[in-house]
């Protein structure tokens, strides 16, 4: 069954409501984004996530020390890294927490992914332009070749998630803007989330 992460949660009401829909993971963004929240706010929201749901903090730490501080203060299950942090720094962080490394999908994506393979637990394939679909053919090739779980992101929504899973065959899918109230970044549409989870989970 496909692993599903609902990302970009920004408020307490949505944490509680989304948790009831039972995704596999909930993500909080500290990196530059319309859904960015402060460390203190993330700390409070993370406490609301039930133990049955994995928590993910999305960040761009400048070095391992900064990442370790985030881990210490927030205690997430995963740290999702969205910058080109040096491999030596990622290796240090990997001794403290499970890491998801985001990779922008382009013709060089697999070569880049291979450099991190020994030091992370999973890869997230994202679009260069946030909230848009990328080349799923490249993603499918990466998912097939990677020795680690691959999570597909970038422009997913309830309408295209089944096709995306069918074509790419990822370990998991990640959605943020595709399940929001139109024009309100960070505010989730629960009907869209319900449909997204149901459709992703029904795919075999």
Please describe what each predicted stretch is.
Residues 1-125, 129-204:
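Conserved N-terminal beta1-alpha1 strand-loop-helix module at the mouth
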